[in-house]
């Protein structure tokens, strides 16, 4: 059979997978639908750093020819890959002239895992330079092309939101997955640090870098993260306990020390999110983190700066005129960071990780802002990661949930956070809470 749906590009990954498995949708048909969408929208959004339609269709035909009994759990599902993640059959350029047309003949570990599961590696999505600056690539927010899609995983967030791809990989060192998720009105997850291999990803900070995933539904996040090996320990009812639904569940509302940076859109979104949860029988308790957490932004900034000095020294030595002044400043240590400051930041954050696990473990999840407000106007910058960086440094899993909007009608998300290595629990909570926020939050995509 062949699918009669006019536009398969509108399908979520799990919807498409069901149709491919039932032989109602050919992989080639699906790929052609996505390519048609990209062709019609690329001039507006510009989400792709590399795309080869002929190669995509050839790979799709090969996947269609695979016998049913030999097909993997992601058979035929297209995935976009941020252009700081190695792909053996596509260039990896890092949005840097130093790496123009650079080919590495291996897949990054996450790409290899997805490919082995039958995924169709579709192309490379745009990124800021080395996923390390706030200067945006020439990628535009699909909901309002006068605004940034966020970064540094700019193309992944924009492409998923614009129905150009059902799922995409990103990375996060500060807020590079959660921020584009919020600005583009889609689901995005930064799993627990270390839960997914980072082999084959451009290194910025070994203690912060984390693979991220974008999708248009929590079921899709569960699907891809399950294949990537993200799982929780078995727990007893008396320990964490399984999530039994929103009714009666406890949520901790955490504004954090950077709350003064919240704009009217995020303030309203947090208020509405709490109200929706309470209206469905949840208990929402606003909590203040211990004062030592106030040091998190400065500690995160210290680690970013010092680790960048190490990570980008090779590019600096090759030709410092071909990297941004932002990065040369890190390598030259313009801020004057010392090893003592670096150690204090590393040790300080490490001491807080067990604390946040204990705090978050008292609740179904913590509810916290994703971003200060709607996506800013212009593509010269990608917006602030102020509300994301703490959770990145603490290594906790975080999910952005869409559903809210700002003063200009653009999407704003909120985040749910759980203790480390409670990723599947967090996804179970996000699935139920996300439905409520989508239904009652007030924002719907018009794309």
Predicted regions and their residues:
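Short helix-loop capping/hinge segments that flank enzyme active sites or metal/cofactor-binding pockets
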Residues: 4, 74-94, 245-250, 302-357, ...
């Amino acid at each position: 059979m062949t699918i009669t749906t006019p536009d398969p590009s509108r399908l979520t990954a799990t919807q498409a997978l069901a149709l491919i498995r039932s032989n109602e949708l050919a992989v080639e048909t699906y790929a052609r639908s996505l390519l048609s969408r990209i062709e019609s929208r690329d001039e507006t959004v510009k989400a792709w750093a590399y795309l080869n339609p002929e190669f995509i269709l050839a790979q799709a035909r090969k996947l269609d020819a695979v016998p049913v009994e030999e097909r993997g759990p992601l058979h035929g599902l297209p995935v976009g890959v941020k252009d700081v993640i190695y792909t053996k059959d596509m260039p990896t350029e890092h949005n840097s002239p130093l790496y123009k047309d650079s080919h590495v003949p291996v897949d990054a570990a996450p790409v290899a895992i997805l490919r082995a599961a039958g995924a169709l590696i579709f192309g490379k999505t745009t990124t800021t330079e080395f996923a390390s600056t706030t200067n945006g690539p020439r990628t535009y927010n699909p909901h309002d092309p006068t605004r940034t899609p966020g970064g540094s995983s700019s193309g992944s967030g924009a492409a998923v939101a614009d129905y150009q791809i059902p799922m995409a990989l990103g990375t996060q060192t500060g807020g590079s997955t959660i921020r584009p998720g919020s600005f583009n009105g889609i689901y995005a997850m930064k799993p627990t640090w270390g839960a997914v291999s980072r082999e084959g990803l451009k290194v910025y900070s070994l203690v912060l870098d984390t693979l991220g995933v974008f999708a248009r539904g929590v079921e899709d996040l569960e699907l891809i993260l399950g294949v990537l090996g993200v799982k929780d320990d078995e727990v007893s009812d008396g320990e964490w306990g399984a999530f039994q639904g929103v009714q009666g569940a406890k949520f901790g509302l955490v504004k954090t020390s950077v709350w003064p940076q919240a704009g009217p859109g995020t303030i309203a979104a947090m208020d509405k999110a709490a109200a929706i949860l309470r209206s469905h029988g949840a208990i929402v308790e606003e909590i203040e983190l211990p004062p030592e957490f106030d040091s998190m932004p400065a500690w995160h900034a210290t680690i970013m700066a010092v680790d960048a000095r190490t990570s980008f020294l090779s590019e600096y030595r090759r030709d410092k005129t071909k990297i941004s002044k932002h990065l040369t400043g890190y390598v030259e240590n313009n801020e004057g960071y010392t090893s003592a400051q670096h150690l204090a930041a590393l040790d300080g954050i490490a001491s807080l990780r067990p604390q946040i696990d204990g705090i978050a473990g008292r609740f179904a999840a913590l509810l916290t802002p994703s971003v200060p407000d709607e996506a800013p106007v212009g593509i010269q910058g990608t917006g602030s990661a102020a509300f994301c960086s703490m959770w990145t440094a603490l290594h906790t899993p975080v999910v952005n949930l869409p559903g809210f909007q700002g003063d200009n009608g653009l999407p704003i998300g909120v985040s749910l956070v759980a203790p480390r290595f409670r990723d599947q629990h967090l996804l179970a909570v996000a699935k139920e809470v996300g439905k409520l926020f989508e239904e009652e939050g007030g924002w719907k995509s018009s794309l």
